[in-house]
């Protein structure tokens, strides 16, 4: 089962399950008892790249930690429960992954989650700024288009802001794009790579199918349809789960893939590239997802948008107003915090 999980999308994920991989990454998962947090913690526990795994939530973490601790892999697991234990969970961490928050229900957009998740992310990232200011911060909590600006503003307030270490995890958009294009063209999804830029909600998700490797040719009707499916794939899962949650397993997989790529880069591996929603100067939007070359200190180089088609140019132009509004909403939230 786990070998099948390890197979697709991303050499980093495959390597993380190999016994030859050696590392001592200390990783914390905040929101570890939730629908994404539990399978994400399982994937992290299963990787030899991780030597210490600390799990935090406001309920059930001792049980999740006890369960995971019985797995015969090298990562030492410890659970932390409630705000008073959060500092100990974070001390010494190299990477912090935050999937905490409420999931979407049918009829909700990612933006509908803002009121609840904004304060959760602000609280957790404030603790990160205080107790592990040098760690890489990976935000999964939606709406990512707003929670990344929130994280940045919180770190600025604490005087420890480093834009090269704060990542909005958009990897699921890439995973979905790879899968859907592979299905459409009869390809092995493990060998397909579609960069996805922009943001992480609806029309701000911009798959660059013109840059797909291997190169694929699609008629405009298929291109429009598959682009729409990639943009609304999260809603597809929310509807299919019929009120029982949102994408959890695929999101955990994508989150683990991003963390393993980051750890590979921290270890000095060269040529590690992932897309992520970060502080950016690629457009007139202050945050934007593009392919990033990762390194020991986080973002080594923003690889930018590259050559794109007129269809993709149009999508960027249409996405920017919504993206700017979501970013401003996040920034204003922190400014108005007491």
From Swiss-Prot:
Reading the lineage from the top rank, the first entry is Eukaryota
State the EC number(s). Answer: 1.1.1.37
- Listed GO cellular component terms? cytoplasm; membrane; mitochondrial matrix; mitochondrion
Q: Where in the cell is it found?
A: Mitochondrion matrix
* Residues with N6-malonyllysine modification: 239, 307, 329
Chain positions with Phosphoserine modification? 246, 326
Oligomeric and partner information: Homodimer.
Q: What is this protein called?
A: Malate dehydrogenase, mitochondrial
**Record organism:** Felis catus (Cat)
Taxonomy, top ranks, is: Eukaryota, Metazoa, Chordata, Craniata, Vertebrata
């Amino acid at each position: 089962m786990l070998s099948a999980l390890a197979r697709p999308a991303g050499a980093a994920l495959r390597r993380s399950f190999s016994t030859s991989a050696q590392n001592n990454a200390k990783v914390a998962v905040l929101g570890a008892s939730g629908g994404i947090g539990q399978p994400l913690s399982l994937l992290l526990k299963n990787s030899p790249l991780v030597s210490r795994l600390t799990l935090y939530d406001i309920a059930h973490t001792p049980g999740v930690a006890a369960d995971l601790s019985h797995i015969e892999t090298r990562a030492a697991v410890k659970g932390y429960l409630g705000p008073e234990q959060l500092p100990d969970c974070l001390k010494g961490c190299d990477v912090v992954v935050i999937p905490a928050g409420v999931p979407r229900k049918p009829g909700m957009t990612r933006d509908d989650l803002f009121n609840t998740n904004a304060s959760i992310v602000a609280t957790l990232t404030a603790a990160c700024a205080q107790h592990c200011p040098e760690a890489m911060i990976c935000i999964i909590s939606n709406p990512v288009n707003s929670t990344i600006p929130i994280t940045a503003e919180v770190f600025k307030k604490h005087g420890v802001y480093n834009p090269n270490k704060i990542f909005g995890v958009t990897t699921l958009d890439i995973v979905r794009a790879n899968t859907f294009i592979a299905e459409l063209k009869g390809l092995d999804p493990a060998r397909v790579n579609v960069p996805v830029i922009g943001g992480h909600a609806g029309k701000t998700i911009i798959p660059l199918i013109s840059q797909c490797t291997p190169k694929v040719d699609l008629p405009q009707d298929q291109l429009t349809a598959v682009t729409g499916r990639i943009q609304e794939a999260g809603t597809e899962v929310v509807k299919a789960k019929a009120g029982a949650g949102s994408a959890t397993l695929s999101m955990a997989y994508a989150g683990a893939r991003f963390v393993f790529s980051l750890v590979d880069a921290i270890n000095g591996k060269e040529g590690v590239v992932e897309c992520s929603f970060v502080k950016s100067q690629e457009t007139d939007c202050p945050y934007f997802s593009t392919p990033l070359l990762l390194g020991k200190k986080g973002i080594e180089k923003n690889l930018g948008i590259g050559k794109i088609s007129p269809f993709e140019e149009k999508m960027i132009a249409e996405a920017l107003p919504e993206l700017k509004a979501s970013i401003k909403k996040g920034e204003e939230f922190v400014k108005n915090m007491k």
